[in-house]
Amino acid sequence: MNSLSPELALSRISPELRPLLCSIVRNGRVGLDSSSCLRITDLKSGCTSLMPGPCCDRFKLHIPYAGETLKWDIIFNARDPELPPDFIFGEDADFLPEPSELPNLVSWDSGKPECLLLLVKEMLQQYHQYQCQRLRDSSRLLFEYDSLLEDPNYGRNMEIYAGRKNSWTGEFSARFLLKLPVDFSNIPIYLLKDTALDPGEDVALLSVSFEDAEATQVFPKLYLSPSIEHALGGSSALHIPAFPSGGCLIDYVPQVCQLLTNKVQYVIQGYHKRREYIAAFLSHFGMGVVEYDAVGFTKLTLLLMWKDFCFLVHVDLPLYFPRDQPTLTFQSIYHFTSSGQLYSQVQKSYPYSPRWDGNEMAKRAKAYFKSFIPQFQEGAFANGKL
């Protein structure tokens, strides 16, 4: 397989066919996984070597589907570019689309740049039905599919890849890929800013692999688009439960949806609670506030004085605040460590309750500062250097 950049691949395509391929490689997002694009490889030509200029008119199309990559050969005729292409469906030799149900094949228009992309999408719809029919080899997996199909939350956003045989046991197996109906629209935009180049929509996909027809070995895995994974605290922030022995997808999938929805709500709530917290500190400490994060409300620095001893307090508010307690870092402005850093002490355990409002937290923090400063000052003089 020769992997080429999209632009280099296009440069080798016959000019008459190039607009059709442009739509494929530049706008080719199909199916549930909007982060994966269609790719073309193995460019070849059916023309004689005497034909001038770029004349590739056949290639292999890589299509993301249900966690697999389908590889279909698409064959044009550069000498008669107005004709529709032929398709070879790789390992799915028994997949035979019904031509009359492919409008963009019946009314093929080589002058319409998106015609090939639309035809591929129509074929994928038939391919989905083909895979669903293969589930009939397993009554248990067919039950899983029918149960999901009856629920409008899942039935319209599901891909199936079925009928793979385990080379050791000969068992039938299948994979379900579902787009979870979780609302990400209210996640604070600043959490998504570092993924501005993230392709596709914000989405959560649940892949569930059945390694045998009786569902004794089931392996779920959650995939989040990069922006959502970043917003929720990284790949390690969310662990989905194992698929229960004897369980069913129609019971398991809503549990994962609820888990993810709760996580999103924690993040949204944390943003508003952090904003409330910092507003309360601005009110209580006034001119003592040196700086604060006015976008995500994740940091706050105070300059305070106790008996002519000046010090800084850095407050770091976690993503899942108020469930998780803020970290306080006390820092002397006079004393240095042996490594040349300002002497500091980190406090992660102090009077705190996630049920307090921002005003109560600010009042309690002020009281804690007063009680802790003598100890901090003593440590600064004993361990720091002026």
UniProtKB/Swiss-Prot annotation:
Keywords of the record: Apoptosis, Cell cycle, Cell division, Chromatin regulator, Cytoplasm, DNA damage, DNA repair, Mitosis, Nucleus, Repeat, Ubl conjugation pathway
Subcellular locations according to the entry: Cytoplasm; Nucleus
GO MF: polyubiquitin modification-dependent protein binding
Region annotation UEV-like 2: where it falls in the sequence: 278-367
GO terms of biological process kind: apoptotic process; cell division; chromatin organization; double-strand break repair; mitotic G2 DNA damage checkpoint signaling; positive regulation of DNA repair; response to ionizing radiation
Keyword RNA-binding: no
Record bears the keyword Transmembrane helix: no
Disulfide cysteine pairs (residue numbers): none
Top-level taxon of origin: Eukaryota
Task of the protein: Component of the BRCA1-A complex, a complex that specifically recognizes 'Lys-63'-linked ubiquitinated histones H2A and H2AX at DNA lesion sites. The BRCA1-A complex also possesses deubiquitinase activity that specifically removes 'Lys-63'-linked ubiquitin on histones H2A and H2AX. In the BRCA1-A complex, it acts as an adapter that bridges the interaction between babam1/nba1 and the rest of the complex, thereby being required for the complex integrity. Component of the BRISC complex, a multiprotein complex that specifically cleaves 'Lys-63'-linked ubiquitin in various substrates.
Free-text note on domains in this protein's UniProt record: Contains 2 ubiquitin-conjugating enzyme family-like (UEV-like) regions. These regions lack the critical Cys residues required for ubiquitination but retain the ability to bind ubiquitin.
Protein's recorded name: BRISC and BRCA1-A complex member 2
